[in-house]
Amino acid sequence: MARQCELTGKKANNGYTVSHSHRRTKCLQKANLQTKRIWSPTLKRWLKLQVSTKVIKDLKRKSIDALLKI
């Protein structure tokens, strides 16, 4: 399974680690993904999704059905 949010599509970002002497080495900034079981009232079943922490925060405000329509 890819390290990508199943709802937003958020994935890793390429960047640099910069030392004090400004030497740059490439690094991969991974998305903060968590596996969550989320209840869907319309589907009447649990959904096991790998989602970003921003989506988990949005789930406290909106239902999963509202987020799936995005």
Curated annotation (Swiss-Prot):
InterPro entries, alphabetized: Ribosomal_bL28, Ribosomal_bL28/bL31-like_sf, Ribosomal_bL28_bact-type, Ribosomal_bL28_sf
Name of this protein: Large ribosomal subunit protein bL28c
Keyword set, alphabetical order: Cyanelle, Plastid, Ribonucleoprotein, Ribosomal protein
HAMAP family attached to this UniProt entry: Ribosomal_bL28
Gene Ontology biological process terms in this record: translation
Keyword DNA damage appears in the UniProt entry: no
Family, as annotated: Belongs to the bacterial ribosomal protein bL28 family.
Matching Gene3D superfamilies: Ribosomal protein L28/L24
Domain of life of the organism encoding this protein: Eukaryota
